[in-house]
Amino acid sequence: MMPQSLPDTTTPKRRFRWPTGMPQLVALLLVLLVDSLVAPHFWQVVLQDGRLFGSPIDILNRAAPVALLAIGMTLVIATGGIDLSVGAVMAIAGATTAAMTVAGFSLPIVLLSALGTGILAGLWNGILVAILKIQPFVATLILMVAGRGVAQLITAGQIVTFNSPDLSWFGSGSLLFLPTPVIIAVLTLILFWLLTRKTALGMFIEAVGINIRAAKNAGVNTRIIVMLTYVLSGLCAAIAGIIVAADIRGADANNAGLWLELDAILAVVIGGGSLMGGRFNLLLSVVGALIIQGMNTGILLSGFPPEMNQVVKAVVVLCVLIVQSQRFISLIKGVRSRDKT
């Protein structure tokens, strides 16, 4: 009788996978570590006049507008689109805020009007993309160019300044020992997370980004979903515009939100979002915004000219896009398979 061989009971080795968000958190810690090496007192935080001050707090404060833009941009990119107009929408909202404040309107009317401009801008983009089927890049590029002109028309081509302590609180005040913009960004993140993860909206957005035709066949109103993402992106841009205008107590239509649309896109990409659409993570997009602001702060603290920011961001975008490319992924998979053999 031939001896029977015992069955192989060894379990296959599991491949190690980073926990969700770990690469982004490690990158953020590395950026902050480099900043601390450049500035010896980087981690020093003091409490003064009921508010925390220090470089880490300043990073949180300065990252708030980009984080707000990134929250809205995340939803748009998740549908496979892009919104290049968020910087211009910031300028429009800021110009509306300053002009109406100078005209003597009450604070609630000013805020509602500024938020309304963002919603209308997002609705305009949504109609062009979802209804008229214009490519998102081209559709939002129209408002990106025209929006600056609209903001200049609102301010009559002038830098409008105002003196309203109540409005200024939204840009330079404090709440719970933290700058007001940080609190606003956190509350917006929580609200959008609840909206997308505790309702079916998030699933619909991801379905549209993964396969819009399949989502439509499944009964999803893809036009409404796409339009809604652009409306929410415009709303986030308007909130950021109010914060910036309140911080400087004025509106500069030429420079408000200039090139911040690129920072918002970069924040989403750093957060793991794919420009092809699909799954998204709002929290990691905010972490991406913190990484960008951390790099900006490090460059300024190290004494390099501010123009270096754009070069560094371009290199980061290139590296992230290469890592996300199908060719690079296939190459890595091929190397792993050869190592196993």
Curated annotation (Swiss-Prot):
One Gene Ontology cellular component: plasma membrane
InterPro entries: ABC_transp_permease, YtfT
Keywords of the record: Cell inner membrane, Cell membrane, Membrane, Sugar transport, Transmembrane, Transmembrane helix, Transport
CDD domains: TM_PBP1_transp_AraH_like
GO biological process: hexose import across plasma membrane
Any one GO molecular function term: transmembrane transporter activity
Record topology, Periplasmic segments: 47-65, 108, 158-174, 245-255
Cytoplasmic topological domain: 1-25, 130-136, 196-223, 277-281, 324-341
Location in the cell: Cell inner membrane
Listed transmembrane segments: 26-46, 66-86, 87-107, 109-129, 137-157, 175-195, 224-244, 256-276, 282-302, 303-323
Record membrane topology: Multi-pass membrane protein
General function of this protein: Part of the ABC transporter complex YtfQRT-YjfF involved in galactofuranose transport. Probably responsible for the translocation of the substrate across the membrane.
NCBIfam families in alphabetical order: YtfT_transport (NF041862)
PANTHER family for this protein: ABC TRANSPORTER PERMEASE PROTEIN YPHD-RELATED-RELATED, GALACTOFURANOSE TRANSPORTER PERMEASE PROTEIN YTFT
Similarity section: Belongs to the binding-protein-dependent transport system permease family. AraH/RbsC subfamily.
Subunit structure: The complex is composed of two ATP-binding proteins (YtfR), two transmembrane proteins (YtfT and YjfF) and a solute-binding protein (YtfQ).
Full protein name: Galactofuranose transporter permease protein YtfT
Organism: Escherichia coli (strain K12)
Encoding gene, per UniProt annotation: ytfT
